[in-house]
Amino acid sequence: MAYYDALFASPATGLGARLNRAQIERHFRRLGVAPGGRVAEIGPGRGEMAERCLKAGMSYVALDANPTVCALVRELGGEAVEGLAPPLALEDGSADAVYANSVVEHMPDHLRALELFQEMARVARPGGRVVVHSPDLLACGVHFWNSEYSHGFPTTRRRLLQICHDAGLRPVSAEYAAGPLSGLSARAVGLAMRRFPHNLAAALCLGRVSAEQWYKTRTALMRSVLLVAEK
């Protein structure tokens, strides 16, 4: 997993870090878990949600195939289970909320995407939440495929809601987002990021951030979908 090791090792820009913190805070509020509750995260990335949950006095466990990521979570004080998803090597009804940020789109097809949702539903306690955040193919266009080579399952608001129903979950909300933004502002910023000339922006940023850093920030601000469902 050399690509993802390098991806996580590369520093975020100041703007990128601020946007990510704001986005994580917004997702954290959607979890609806009180201090002392338990959160399970699929694909913890750089550990931002792990850190936020532990700071709030919650129990936290992550599942990831990357040993480097699992080690980071343990250093933060959380639990980590190394393995591919799905299935999820977690007990039935063991979490008050299950969170998957930028994970569903990495499933190879709709059957694996459905299996992932079914597994998240299994791990959530009765009345618990499943919170999913994924890019919107309709807004990202070719950038959905270009941003990461492992993107396999096209995610849209409609498709995520359909899987949610088939997994036996009750949708609570399915809102468009762009980084930490929502509503009309998310739509406007997402559209601007899609249409802004990438080469021009990279040239203007030359000497301050790399073209790759700009591209990551740009794709992070394209329209995405934040789905909240209950078991």
Label every model-predicted segment:
Residues 69, 138-140, 178-180:
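Feature marks short, surface-exposed loop/turn motifs that line or immediately flank catalytic pockets
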Residues 114-129:
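A short glycine-rich, Lys/Arg-flanked "PGG" loop and its adjoining helix->strand segment in the class I
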Residues 97-111:
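A short SAM/SAH-binding and catalytic strip from SAM-dependent methyltransferases
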Residues 87, 105, 109, 139:
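Active-site micro-motifs of SAM-dependent methyltransferase domains
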Residues 152-168:
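Short alpha-helix
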Residues 131-152:
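Short, glycine-/aromatic-enriched active-site segment of Class I SAM-dependent methyltransferases
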Residues 1-87, 91, 97-101, 117, ...:
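Conserved N-terminal segment of class I S-adenosyl-L-methionine
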Residues 176-231:
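A C-terminal cap/extension of S-adenosyl-L-methionine-dependent methyltransferases
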